[in-house]
């Protein structure tokens, strides 16, 4: 009976046949199959399109162009692959979106000793040519080759694998980037999306690393996390971590299976693609309530973004009507009007009472000069984006939240310029995802109002007043904490625009 061992699970054996992704007791020529079977489901091999797959094992690189089949169901590493007669011919190893490689004797291959050399993988963009370690348009590459021809060749230090839609190439370069060798395969291929991530528990930020890995794999079609731990009971430590972050999973249809081992555990991630949104740890979309600015969970974010998409954005908010407010009235409209008048003041008095409180459109806070820039960095993005996502509002820094009196903060002019620069910087970093045609920027105004004390003619005490208007579309305080696996095996974070583009409205 043929046996197959996945390299991803430590299955490399130098005494067995080795192919990209597997060691096996048999050497199957997988080029001869046109149909394969996985769990009694039949899948056609894709014609004239291949996957470049590779393993790093014992300082050895094993790479090859392999056949692939299309499957819309999630398959795990190690799942058996059979021919139509019921004979096992391979196991699941590599995946690119909905395509799975068939590991065994494939087409063009590359077997290297990695002692003293590196190897890098690239997607060859359509229309580009290659020289050594760079790709560009043909004329630029031609000039590059002429420039490098004058250099004497040196020993190879790096190999570069270029995978394109119509052709694949392997180049080797010396320390100066001079191309020493080139192989060209007239076959179109894709690179696999790595679907194995290693996490070690007991190290700093291990919970963050685990949640990031889960998000990245779920958003990339699934995969496996290999978990080790500094502690003896790796399975116990893992389950504690998973339980502590279970509330983060924004995709209820996604799930995982845990396979326990003595020294390591494997968490198999399965994404069914039934959820309307990506797996996300934090949306970084905030809304303002009466008492706080709250981060939207994924359902709130979906509802909010769906409304914006349906309406094509929001129109500017009309100006507040002018009218007098009876004593003691503290409705949202009167509070906002009083805040607007306070914002327009040219000067303030220390310990002056403020006749409005925090509301959905107003927030005031106090902070020492020493902590001012730190608090601005930590809190400004979420507060101002929450105003922009609601109906606009005012932030006053230097008003005591308990006594509702003006206290201000005392700083010099140079420091004040730094604070003003910080505020501008953090507002410009806010990301707006537009559903409208105008695509306007965030509108805001910032003032530093002098605070005078009785008997003092000059002052360097201020209240910082920031006014933010309602934004036409969705304002993100930062990029969503939602990741995916790229073809190099790195975890990348979705930009706000990318994240929204993946929502199934």
Curated annotation (Swiss-Prot):
Where do the record's region annotations for Schlafen-like lie?
A: 239-505
- What upregulates or represses it? Expressed in the early phase of the viral replicative cycle.
Q: Is Secreted there in the keyword field?
A: no
Region (Poxin-like) residue spans? 1-238
Listed under GO biological process in this entry are: symbiont-mediated suppression of host innate immune response
Q: Which GO terms describe its molecular function?
A: 2',3'-cyclic GMP-AMP binding; nuclease activity
Name of a matching Pfam family: B3R
Q: Does the keyword Nuclease apply?
A: yes
Miscellaneous note of the record: In some poxviruses, the poxin is expressed as a poxin-schlafen fusion protein.
Q: What is known of its domains?
A: The substrate binding site is formed by the N-terminus of a monomer and the C-terminus of the opposite monomer.
Instruction: Specify the protein name.
Output: Poxin-Schlafen
The organism is Cowpox virus (strain Brighton Red) (CPV)
Gene encoding this chain? OPG188
